[in-house]
Amino acid sequence: MSPQAPGKQQEDDVATVRTPEELRTPEQLRGALATLLESAPDVAVAVSGGVDSMTLAAVCARELGARAWAYHAVSPAVPPAATERVREYARRYGWQLRVIEAGEFDDPEYRANPFNRCYFCKRNLYDRIAEHTTMQVFSGANADDLGDFRPGLVAAAERAVRHPFVELNISKAEVRALAQSMGLVEVQDLPAMPCLSSRVESGIRIEAADLAFVNEIEDWLRESLGASTVRCRIGHAGVRVELDDQSLAGSGGDIEAHVRARCEASDRQFVGFVPYARGSAFLRPEVA
């Protein structure tokens, strides 16, 4: 079954507001996770390359050793930089890593890009992992992820996937503090980076060529502008690029000319640069 209730898409971090006094120390977090993992079976951590799943994989590798595996799924929707980050950490810290094909591009329901596309993405991910192992699957979802529309969590529940950070009510801020305390310097401050398909407006078919174009433009703007937040959106009206305020101020002249030329070279209409708006490619169905 797939979720039908519409809602606002959670594309990026929406952090639970907690006072400094309410945040647990990294030592307390590691202790709580160690206690949870004492009774855990062998585990397969679904690792996307973001701060949450990378931190969870590091904790599991430290606590469980050979009983923990990291599973990373590749597809046109996964930025190559995320895959390289996972591979590098596995080499550096001795993680047991298996890289698999996500398979969602073979799913017509996913390719149709409905409002609950994430359900079909996670359904394919967890089913592919299950083809390789019978271990308990862990995801890096954190407590902040429960406050919005997350159809991927429905697919996880249907497949008995566990979320240790959710079980221990660990917030995004606590995950980042935990990553810092463990020396995961490349990931501790990573901005939210949803899959590339999130850049495509609901109802527009997901195409690998579109996602490769999105990744190219975003990578170039990060390098050229030092942009902390950049989203290349493909919509019915054309391509618009959303930037953080500082980057937006420097996006004219040669920067705009380059992006416009790349759009024209691939037969795309460039709409322009606009301020970043979370989840703006998501079109929610009307609710009676």
What are these regions (language model features)?
Residues W69, I234-D245:
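Short, aliphatic-rich beta-strand segments
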Residues N113, R117, I206-A209, G250-D254:
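Alpha-helix N-cap and loop-to-helix initiation/capping positions
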Residues P3-S181, V239, H258-Q269, A277-A288:
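ATP-dependent adenylation/nucleotidyltransferase module used to activate substrates
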Residues V166-K172, R176-R231, P275:
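Mid-to-C-terminal catalytic subdomains of enzymes
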Residues N215, R222-S224, V230-R233, D245-A288:
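Auxiliary Fe-S-binding modules of radical SAM enzymes
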